[in-house]
UniProtKB/Swiss-Prot annotation:
Homodimer. One of its GO terms (molecular function) is tRNA binding. It is found in: Cytoplasm. Keywords: Cytoplasm, Hydrolase, RNA-binding, tRNA-binding. It holds the Pfam family Tyr_Deacylase. Its main location: cytoplasm. GO terms for cellular component: cytoplasm. InterPro entries: Daa-tRNA_deacyls_DTD, DTD-like_sf. This is D-aminoacyl-tRNA deacylase. It comes from Ectopseudomonas mendocina (strain ymp).
Amino acid sequence: MKLLIQRVSAARVEVEGEVVGGIDQGLLALVGIEPQDDQASLTRALHKLLNYRVFSDEAGKMNRSLTDVQGGLLLVSQFTLAADTKSGMRPSFSSAAPPAQGEALFDALVEAARARHPQVATGRFGANMQVHLVNDGPVTFLLEV
């Protein structure tokens, strides 16, 4: 599972002009699910999302987690993160999970996140989405679990 996380001061997802999910301060996580991902991957991913220290403390050091700052978490499924880009001039998506598996694991991630964190929003799986964000920093990390 690949997670592209961005520290944001605000973010929202629109589908066909309608806002389907949004947060204020927090993390936007683009989630790429791969065929080998399972419940253990999901558990590790959620632990990282909630506890990875990317928010500044009083000294300006990245020492606070999403849980510490009680920020929002916006989860957006993005199968293109799992693309194979090593050869040629066109990405291959054979390394991404099949849609049914991807949707099941993404839904399970959302459900687990909502059980452990008070502010969770999402995009819409499989939809053509417009993601709007204000990257704070900018701070962006690619996590692989």
